[in-house]
From Swiss-Prot:
Chief location bin: cytoplasm
Protein's name in the database: Forkhead box protein O
Phosphothreonine modifications at: 50
Cited function: Transcription factor involved in the regulation of the insulin signaling pathway. Consistently activates both the downstream target Thor\d4EBP and the feedback control target InR. Involved in negative regulation of the cell cycle, modulating cell growth and proliferation. In response to cellular stresses, such as nutrient deprivation or increased levels of reactive oxygen species, foxo is activated and inhibits growth through the action of target genes such as Thor.
DNA-binding region residue numbers: 101-207
Listed Pro residues bias regions: 334-343
Length: 628
């Protein structure tokens, strides 16, 4: 091969128990010259003939890495190869040869091959050729049959060791170059072992750590967690000064809030509460000693409530749920019939209980106001309507017995006596207590009035208009309480005119004639004002009820017409289907008749042909006259 500077140096051994190649050749020649009658005793040998050879008896394995692997990582010049091989062989004085060709490994041979090239690079085929030409062991193993094993080993070592570097060849269709990596570390690349091979070392290291921990415990090293121990803290049992932990370099101590992932409270979402912790500090500046703080019974109960889950904290008061008609699971109005309305005295007793259940330190309840249904005028569909205010103020202070109709389908009306508190005497001194009592009673009166209006209107009007399952004939406004309602005609007209003709107001002439003197009587006395307003409101409500009933009748008629049309269409479709079926039957019958006729004609013609052939006599032809 032209690319090498010189031939591979001869392998000489200086050991006593290993012969060189030349000596081995001389010995073989001498043995060949011996006469045949010289007898040698048969030598016993081991069963296995594989390499490496078994070690001799006094063999001691060196503790450190071989010098050959350390020296072979560098680029070797041609002149220094002899000294390197001698030093490598000198390191193995007490051991047998590692391989069949000597103590050099495949990596060492590849290193010598690449280093002996002029441009310090070889392809894979050139490395094979160098092995066959320069190593005596591979001279007779260059053919394809016997070279598969050692060529595979060479490829394996090229990819395994970090001392070899693969460079892409510039030419197309050519194999890559293999070069020596000058930046590679000495020795083999670190290979990761399985955990099962290092169990003894791991157990030793773990035992040492346990001994150190016990020594620290006995020495009395106390961490920060010993003062205020927590059940979920991962810094357990005085391990704050563990010397070999990467977290403790420099001797720092872990915080007591440091927690392990498995024992942290982030994994238990059910125990977390979005409510802020109870503030036990007073309003002044200095902090409170929590160890000496004595909690009151109310505060301890509050803390016990806050320690529960979110579902336990968001429970609503059962009395309020029954009163408002909400379900505790979903917060939506429930469909079963409501219970009877409680008396005002029961409501007075329930209201302070609800306030106590929703306040911690006497403050106003936060979420109770949002659950109260807002009053809405069912005629004008607005919250701020004068009809509601006039209806609230126009109720008589005496006890009124009315028929209550709950706003739920298929429920019976319940009659309760609503006692309004009209005998309230407020002192002129303006005492705060009397003002609070007055406000509470006014709120209770408003709630009772809202229940009156809402139950009557929702039970009779809204149930019919919004529920499609109920028939339209159940709409009835005869029991509508119009005696105590007052209405502003100007506001009503403006409200109706703002709908741009969507709603009609039909005021009869008699009602207009009665409204004219009533307007004059408004300026004279308050009694005439209330009566005229009552009459006006009654006329408007009657007119609106008439228009609503007319619209409902129209809707009912339209629905009936649509139903009749659908029935007619269904009947027509059924008739068409019947006609099509009859036509198909007729066609099938005609086809069958035609087929039967064809078959009959065919059989008849066949019979006639057979008869004709059978009845014809045999014709004997006579010879012509000229034949004698």
């Amino acid at each position: 091969m032209d690319g090498f500077a010189q031939d591979w140096p001869s392998l000489t051994h200086t050991t006593d128990n290993v012969l060189t190649m030349d000596q081995l050749g001389g010995v073989s020649g001498a043995v060949g010259d011996l006469p045949g009658d010289v007898g040698f005793e048969p030598q016993t040998r081991a069963r296995s003939n594989t390499w490496p050879c078994p070690h001799p008896e006094p063999f001691v394995e060196p503790a450190d890495e071989l010098d050959s692997t350390k020296a072979s990582n560098q680029q070797l010049a041609a002149g220094d190869s002899q000294q390197t091989i001698q030093s490598a062989n000198a390191a193995k004085k007490n051991s047998a040869r590692r391989n069949a060709w000597g103590n050099l490994s495949y990596a060492d041979l590849i290193t010598h091959a690449i280093g002996s090239a002029t441009d310090k690079r070889l392809t894979l085929s050139q490395i094979y050729e160098w092995m066959v030409q320069n190593v005596p062991y591979f001279k007779d193993k260059g053919d394809s049959n016997s070279s598969a094993g050692w060529k595979n080993s060479i490829r394996h070592n090229l990819s395994l060791h970090n001392r070899f570097m693969r460079v892409q060849n510039e030419g197309t269709g050519k194999s890559s170059w293999w070069m020596l990596n000058p930046e590679a570390k000495p020795g083999k690349s670190v290979r990761r072992r399985a955990a099962s091979m290092e169990t003894s070392r791991y157990e030793k290291r773990r035992g040492r750590a346990k001994k150190r921990v016990e020594a620290l415990r006995q020495a009395g090293v106390v961490g920060l967690n010993d003062a205020t121990p927590s059940p979920s803290s991962s810094v357990s049992e005085g391990l704050d000064h563990f010397p070999e932990s990467p977290l403790h370099s420099g001797g720092f101590q872990l915080s007591p809030d440091f927690r392990q992932r498995a024992s942290s409270n982030a994994s238990s979402c059910g125990r977390l509460s979005p409510i802020r912790a109870l503030d036990l500090e007073p309003e002044w500046g200095f902090t409170v000693d929590y160890q000496n703080t004595t909690l009151t019974q109310a505060q301890s109960q509050v803390l016990d409530q806050l320690a529960g889950s979110i579902a336990d904290e968001l429970k609503l008061h059962p009395d309020m749920l029954q009163q408002q008609g909400f379900s505790a699971a979903s917060g939506l109005p429930t469909q079963p019939p409501p219970p009877p309305y409680p008396a005002p005295q029961q409501q007075q007793q329930q209201q302070p209980q609800q306030q106590q259940a929703y306040t911690l330190n006497g403050g106003p309840p936060g979420g109770y106001a949002s659950l109260q249904p807002q009053p809405q005028c069912l005629i004008h569909r607005s919250l701020n309507c004068s009809c509601l205010h006039n209806a609230r103020d126009g109720l008589s202070p005496n006890s009124v017995t009315t028929t209550m109709s709950p706003a739920y389908p298929n429920s019976e009306p319940s009659s309760d006596s609503l006692n309004t508190y009209s005998n309230v005497v407020i002192d002129g001194s303006g005492d705060n207590g009397s003002l609070l009592v007055q406000q509470q009673r006014q709120q209770q009166q408003q709630q009772q009035q809202q229940q009156q209006l809402g139950s009557n209107l929702e039970g009779q009007c809204l149930e019919v208009l919004n529920n499609e399952a109920q028939p339209i004939d159940e709409f009835n406004l005869e029991n509508f309480p119009v005696e105590n309602l007052e209405c502003n005609m100007e506001e009503l007209l403006q409200q109706e005119m703002s709908y741009d003709g969507l709603l009609d107001i039909n005021i009869p002439l008699a009602a207009v004639s009665t409204n004219a003197p009533l307007v004059n009587l408004i300026n004279n006395s308050s009694t005439t004002i209330s009566s005229s307003s009552n009459i006006g409101c009654s006329t408007t409500t009657s007119s609106s009820s008439l228009s609503a009933s007319a619209q409902l009748n129209q809707l009912q008629a339209q629905l009936q017409q649509q139903h009749q049309q659908q029935q007619q269409q269904q009947q027509q479709q059924q008739q068409q289907q019947l006609q099509q079926q009859q036509q198909q039957l007729l066609l099938n019958n005609n086809n069958n008749n035609n087929n039967s006729l064809e078959l009959a004609t065919q059989t008849a013609s066949a019979n006639l042909n057979a008869r004709v052939q059978y009845s014809q006599p045999s014709v004997v032809t006579s010879p012509p006259s000229w034949v004698h």
